[in-house]
Amino acid sequence: MAIYDFIVKSENEKTSKALEKYQKFWTDDEDKYDGMTLKEFKKDGDPGDKVYQYPPLDVDVKLEAFLGEDGSTEIRAYIENGTEEIYVGTAAKTKAKKILKLLQEIDPRITGELYGGKYWKMENSGYVDDRWKEDLTVRVYLEW
């Protein structure tokens, strides 16, 4: 598996259907994804979850990274077709630029906006980010 392949796991039926046009993959049970082999993943995962390879992107994507309270950087990617939002996951702050570089190798149209600092470190503020509703979430795990 190339370092910039994606694993997409959708927990939402509508999003799963939207992703079905992409080619499903898993060729080698010895390959590990999220620390598990394919067999382990299928056994452990929700029966409704589906795993897909994300092809080279053919839509515009905006990438953002936010500094989390634990010092990690949350990477968010938006597919600019008005219907999909992708949550890419968390990564150490030092890896955020590396992830952006890998995404840009897939599709140079991906733009990066790296944010951090006090604004996004909402400690004890009661701030609720309602832009990320569960029914819009697609979880994407990057191998690096």
Question: Which ranges hold each PLM region?
Answer:
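Conserved active-site motif detector
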Residues: 1-144
